[in-house]
Curated annotation (Swiss-Prot):
PANTHER family cross-referenced by the UniProt entry: RRNA PROCESSING PROTEIN EBNA1-BINDING PROTEIN-RELATED, RRNA-PROCESSING PROTEIN EBP2-RELATED
Cellular component annotations (GO), alphabetically ordered: nuclear periphery; nucleolus; preribosome, large subunit precursor
Task performed by this protein: Required for the processing of the 27S pre-rRNA. Probably involved in the step of the processing of the 27 SA precursor into the 27 SB intermediate.
Name of the molecule in the record: rRNA-processing protein EBP2
Species of provenance: Saccharomyces cerevisiae (strain ATCC 204508 / S288c)
Lineage summary: Eukaryota, Fungi, Dikarya, Ascomycota, Saccharomycotina
Amino acid sequence: MAKGFKLKELLSHQKEIEKAEKLENDLKKKKSQELKKEEPTIVTASNLKKLEKKEKKADVKKEVAADTEEYQSQALSKKEKRKLKKELKKMQEQDATEAQKHMSGDEDESGDDREEEEEEEEEEEGRLDLEKLAKSDSESEDDSESENDSEEDEDVVAKEESEEKEEQEEEQDVPLSDVEFDSDADVVPHHKLTVNNTKAMKHALERVQLPWKKHSFQEHQSVTSETNTDEHIKDIYDDTERELAFYKQSLDAVLVARDELKRLKVPFKRPLDYFAEMVKSDEHMDKIKGKLIEEASDKKAREEARRQRQLKKFGKQVQNATLQKRQLEKRETLEKIKSLKNKRKHNEIDHSEFNVGVEEEVEGKRFDRGRPNGKRAAKNAKYGQGGMKRFKRKNDATSSADVSGFSSRKMKGKTNRPGKSRRARRF
């Protein structure tokens, strides 16, 4: 116990020492900060020069901003605007170079003075140029420009024109007929304006159309279907259905033409000695037929697979429902058992609690027992119905008088097969 007490004393003493050291350090920091604040600031000649330069730059920037505002308000050309932008860029570059020089240090004061004078002269020249540009009229632009500036301006203008053309081409709409429907496409399709001048088209058709009605069917041999084919097609994107509709239309037209040619007594069947090659060969038509059959079988298989998936989902739903029902029943029975146990402890059980419904369950499962089971009856007759087997095999008056199981046919045994000679005699 003594050792533990000493250790506690040492720890508390050490903590007190640390607190005292922290307080001393805080006081020292506060005093140093107060002394720094009270120290007088020493202003050198270099600091004054820097302040003057900063003030001059600020004034120049303000003047340039004012000039640019006036310039924008007046109707000046794009070339003058570009010149102003170039001069502003030069000013920014000069500011950056001056900042780098100040960071490196003031080594040569004489060199700095010269640079300052040169900068001041350049700034004054820039101011004069800006004032001239602001006061100049739009009519005297071509006279004041030099050849180099004009070439540069032409290049810039050409670039701007090319950019504008590209933007216009990008913004141009594309007709809806030329667009492939794609989710990633950025093009906005538009509908072309169409003029459905039916009168003019009918008039043109009358001028071009030959009077076939006046002539016989043999001369034109053209059949027009009375009904529209697309009316009978449910899905126009179904290749099989569409091909069947075309086939039916052509077959109807052939039958009409056949009747007309028969009426005119014109031979239309191919002679027996004439063999002409079809437009599409039999191999090609077999390929088309096979492709159509394959597509139809694939479609049927997809539908069957979809139906099986739906049945599987339904089966899973039924299974889940039955499992949930079982879980609920189990939970209810467990809760009943638990409540009965609790009531048994406190002797609060009534006779109604034991009304489980066993008799109803048995009555529900009871089946018709009017007809005896034949298999069971035969076994009982052979082996007995259980119980004591002693003295069962001994005869009495009733058993000896019972002749129901006797058969003379069975006593005789099985009849032997006759020989070959007897069998031959039969036939």
